[in-house]
Amino acid sequence: MKLVFGFVCALFYSFMSFGQITQWTDINYANDSLEGHKLDIYLPDGGQTEYKVVVLIYGSAWFANNMKQMAFQAMGKPLLDGGFAVVSINHRSSGDAKFPAQINDVKAAVRFIRAHADEYRLDTSFIGITGFSSGGHLSSLAGTTNGVKVYKVGDTEMDIEGNVGDCTSFS
């Protein structure tokens, strides 16, 4: 009986906690079939016409390409409670593609957000970005390379902006 009561309480709490948010899951931001190119969008229960956005990037030492749900569970709820739309993204792992593919994916997700802002009620005048561990590194890199298309060190050049997805005009 205690087990059933505990289960019912947990079920009730889960509906109470997440029942009011609007969500879209597994949206492919690059118009391909890669797991590493999916994102989830969550809107708080506020009835606003649009919401400022925070992008979440998971940490995985760049080894995983499908942990966006974990990032939302860890950091998304407090952001929703603060009135922000939360976009939790996947990116290609280091096993799937070499650097700078991961930052190209992050920037492609941001371009997708800008291109589809009206559809998902997102206010792109403010797009924050955060993450933990390798996701924190990618969020810092995204912030410090905003507007930088090519990174050059000596004779080596890297395309930091990338051309992932259909929304390249929203860079």
Residue spans of the language-model regions?
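Serine-hydrolase catalytic-loop signature spanning alpha/beta hydrolases and amidase-signature enzymes
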Residues: 61-66, 86, 112
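Primarily recognizes the serine-hydrolase "nucleophile elbow" in alpha/beta-hydrolase
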Residues: 111-171
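Short amphipathic alpha-helix adjacent to the substrate-entry channel of hydrolases
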Residues: 68-87
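Bacterial Sec-dependent N-terminal signal peptides
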Residues: 1-22
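N-terminal cap/lid segment of alpha/beta-hydrolase-fold proteins
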Residues: 19-49
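Alpha/beta-hydrolase active-site loop
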Residues: 97-118
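Short beta-to-alpha linker loops that shape the active-site pocket of alpha/beta-hydrolase fold enzymes
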Residues: 60, 85, 90-94
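Short beta-strand element of the alpha/beta-hydrolase
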Residues: 50-61
